Amino acid sequence: MIDLEVIHRVQATLVERKGAAPDSSYVASLYAKGTDAICKKVAEEAAETIMAAKDGDRLHLVREVCDLWFHSLVLMSHFDIGVDDIMCEFRRREGISGIDEKKSRPA
């Protein structure tokens, strides 16, 4: 079972950094650059995750997924979306087939 506490602690740190000076931390500098820069970083980390998966190196994949999750958390925080919001959506989808879930989405 995943320890969500560490993710909540990371999220709390990210929220704190939203108001920080851009030169005070990497995350504060990302927030200052705005949505496009954050999205670009998420896309970069997603591509690196895919490449690590194709390489078949488990440790490299774990590290890239961690980077992807981290930058996804930055993006979520940027839009005031918390870990609990995502967990609620997972709970909502639990037990629903992917096909049925997609059909339930607005067009």
What are these regions (language model features)?
Residues 1-65, 69-107:
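Flexible "arm" and connector segments at domain edges
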